[in-house]
Amino acid sequence: MNPSTITNDLTVEILSRLPAKSVARFHCVSKQWGSIFGSPYFKELFLTRSSTKPRLLFAMAEKVNEEKNCVWRFFSTPQLENPYEKSSSTLVAAAEFHVKFSPDKLYICHCYDLKYFSIGYASGLIYLYGDRGEATPLICNPTTGRYAILPNRYTYRKAYSFFGFDPIDKQYKALSIFYPSGPGHSKILTFGAGHMKWRKINCPLRYDRHDIKSEGICINGVLYYLGSTSDCVKDGHGIVSDYVIVCFDIRSEKFTFIDVERFCRLINYKGKLAVIYWEDDVDIYKLYYSDVDEYVEYNINDDDINELRVWVLEDVKKQQWSKYAYTWTDDRFFRRRVSIAGGTASGEIVFSMLKYTPKQPFYVFYFNPERNTLQRVEIQGFGEVLKKTCRVCTFVNHVEDLNVHDFKQLKSVHPPLVDEPDSESD
């Protein structure tokens, strides 16, 4: 075919099938391609195609010194559709390596204690905010390595941070919640809004000083996380439980709260908030054991058949839930090495291992509540890049969205986009 006869529509159709990393690279090939990639039509077409093939995103934190400074590596693998139709007890999926992320002269740290967290995800972007407020806060694209540094969040005390996306105004916001003890103000930052700065934000008096018990998840423009009200003054405030789900509307910047009966895990279940209760689940923040493994060893029986309860929030204002219960054969492997990554669009609950160890298999598990079946999937390919034990954060439903490849917001590029092999002496 003569190149001159290729229509613009056909060019757009062909280019829309490229991976996001290639689109980022080819942006400067020609003015025509740059114009195509930047058009709203192309971005929506690309997003539509990408949304039909969601992926699991793996963020791997490798410690490089004793001060918790680390290198992040990002991988992804196709999110399996109907994994239970295969006959094998263990399926295999290949991980695609995207980028080794450790910009020069930037202190990027990660807390390796399972009780704490230092990374957030929302609509295709990663928010790295360090160990409870330490280090340089930044937002990066895990596919291309482009990033933007945020203003430092100065506080009397350390604070927890969360990351959310408003699909109406197409805005990302970072939320910083201060510790319940001591002075401090919660603050919020709008990403890409001219001169970025942290603004004070007030939490309603009822739960003004709540402790943080989970990572945040953002669903349809609302950020959710689990809080503890044990340090709140309960008299006259109507607080009926030690735990509460904090709901923060990204667009209006308003807080609402949902009381829950005890410690639980939060996931996005078919576009709705859901909480998961294990029969003997425990708030690891309250453990007197220094090691979660020690608690599991002495308190979890391999032969126990527990009840896994899934509550789906149907009406936020009325706080109405659909409640489901499933028998769950628990074991030490799940409690010691696996965390809940989230829920797929078709309703599977995805569990992922917390750590990658060289020369040992790495698994994710798809649990189908309706069928009460569990499918194990071995993820291969990490060992080609990783040579040390790493902490793993897994995110479900990762979709490549060109709207987050905004060259005006993510100005800095972190080359190379391919990893460099470690030397024999490392």
UniProtKB/Swiss-Prot annotation:
Q: Enumerate the CDD domains for this protein.
A: F-box_AtFBW1-like
Give the F-box domain ranges. Answer: 1-48
One short Pfam family name for this protein?
F-box
Top-level taxonomic group: Eukaryota
SUPFAM superfamilies recorded for this chain? F-box domain
Q: Which InterPro entries match?
A: F-box-assoc_dom_typ3 (IPR013187), F-box-assoc_interact_dom (IPR017451), F-box-like_dom_sf (IPR036047), F-box_dom (IPR001810)
- Tell me what this protein is called: F-box protein At2g15640
Origin species: Arabidopsis thaliana (Mouse-ear cress)
